[in-house]
Amino acid sequence: TEKYDLKNNTESRKMPQEVSTLLTSKIYNNHYVDSVVCPSKVSVNFYNEYTEGGYYRKHVDSFKAFPKANNVFFDYGFTLCLDDEHEGGEFVLENEVGEIVYPLKRGQILIFPIIYPHSVNKVTSGSRKAIVGWMSSNVSYEQSYILKHVYQLNADAIKSLNEEMIVKSGVVQNYLIKHWST
């Protein structure tokens, strides 16, 4: 029988504390992340590197990513791209619509519900570096999905400068956040 390798990358859990603290702070203080995810816990866990030929096959993250997580269950995963010095290595997410390929660039972060299967395509040249972690949410995935659409409605209303829509969607968004996070 042929050996099946789920992944071919290098991972390190030895994340410098200052990097973890800075990234956690940036995530907590991002208005969009707060509006959509409403994070209650952010866990910055791994630095990973995919050299030429590196990949991560399709998988689903565990709700409880670590045995010593003190019964913290995670709702979202994220990957933060650290470089542009590679070809291939795209992040692939499978949702209700199908597979979506994200060729992340340096500084881009992708946050996704951990219930979605995902993978990293094979790196064809160079080295892909990223930081990955997980978040718990104060609201359920379904509630967060609704908040995302209300947030987008609010953003669209602001673009159209329709004051009545801005106020209405802001009120609904704030009500939902308050209702679901208590």
Give, region by region, the residue ranges found by the protein language model.
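Catalytic core of non-heme Fe(II) oxygenases with the double-stranded beta-helix
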Residues: 32-149
